[in-house]
Curated annotation (Swiss-Prot):
It is found in: Cell membrane. The gene is qoxC. It is an enzyme of class 1 (oxidoreductase). CDD domains: Ubiquinol_oxidase_III (cd02863). One of its GO terms (molecular function) is oxidoreductase activity, acting on diphenols and related substances as donors, oxygen as acceptor. This is Quinol oxidase subunit 3. The lineage of its organism: Bacteria, Bacillati, Bacillota, Bacilli, Bacillales. InterPro entries: Cyt_c/ubiquinol_Oxase_su3, Cyt_c_oxidase-like_su3, Cyt_c_oxidase_su3-like_sf, Cyt_c_oxidase_su3_a-hlx, QoxC, Ubiquinol_oxase_su3_dom. It is a multi-pass membrane protein. Its EC number is 1.10.3.-. GO terms for biological process: aerobic electron transport chain; aerobic respiration; ATP synthesis coupled electron transport. It catalyses: 2 a quinol + O2 = 2 a quinone + 2 H2O. The keyword Ribonucleoprotein does not apply. It comes from Bacillus subtilis (strain 168).
Length: 204
């Protein structure tokens, strides 16, 4: 049971403390609850997707270029987040900080685009109360966008800890856990991109 030993130097840094291992396990359980949450929101959206109440239709408002930019920003941020974890395992504090900051900037760009998108839709007459479709749309995407925003603040806090404490098994487990969270949000976005935007643009 070598892997269960406290301070196993052969394991990745984030697994080298018992606390880190337990925190990672606990976070996987938390992600299970998040999967249930988003599955419920997706199911609700698909039930409501044809109930536009004679109002503005998604294919009249969805902008391909903006959606592609948002997708590009979030997927590239997943890649840079992965590089940050790689740099962490190499023991490079500078590399972790640089790639994490890039990830945060990309995430902030995504949130900015989404806010701009929502403002545009409301201006064009598509608001939360316009129809059942738009209610499902704003709740689903708003929940995802809120999660991304929370992630940005959370990871910023981890960066501050890194500056004070450096790379330790404790800070490394936090970096790894935040990367799981970030990758999860990217996966959710792929489903949003496919199930909401592509189907909406296709009039499905």
């Amino acid at each position: 049971m070598e892997h269960a030993e406290h301070g196993n130097s052969n394991a990745p840094m984030e697994y080298q403390s018992e606390t880190g291992r337990l925190n990672i396990l606990g976070f996987w359980i938390f992600l299970g609850a998040e999967i249930v949450l988003f599955s419920t929101l997706f199911a609700t959206f698909f039930v409501l997707k044809n109930r536009t109440a004679g109002g503005v239709l998604p294919d009249e408002l969805f902008e391909v270029n903006l959606v592609m930019i948002m997708t590009f920003l979030l997927l590239i941020s997943s890649f840079t987040c992965g590089i940050a974890v790689h740099e962490m395992r190499r023991g490079s504090l500078k590399g972790v900080v640089i790639w994490t900051i890039i990830t945060l900037l990309l995430g902030a760009g995504f949130v900015g685009c989404e806010i701009n998108e929502f403002v545009h839709y409301v201006h064009e007459g598509a608001a939360l109360s316009t129809s059942a479709f738009w209610s499902g749309f704003f709740v689903l995407l708003g929940t995802h966008g809120t999660h991304v925003t929370i992630g940005i603040f959370w990871i910023t806090g981890i960066l501050i800890q890194l500056k004070k404490r450096g790379l330790t098994p404790q800070t490394s487990s936090k970096i790894f856990i935040s990367s799981l969270y970030w990758h999860f949000l990217d996966v959710v976005w792929i489903f949003i991109f496919t199930g909401v935007y592509l189907m909406g643009l296709g009039g499905l």
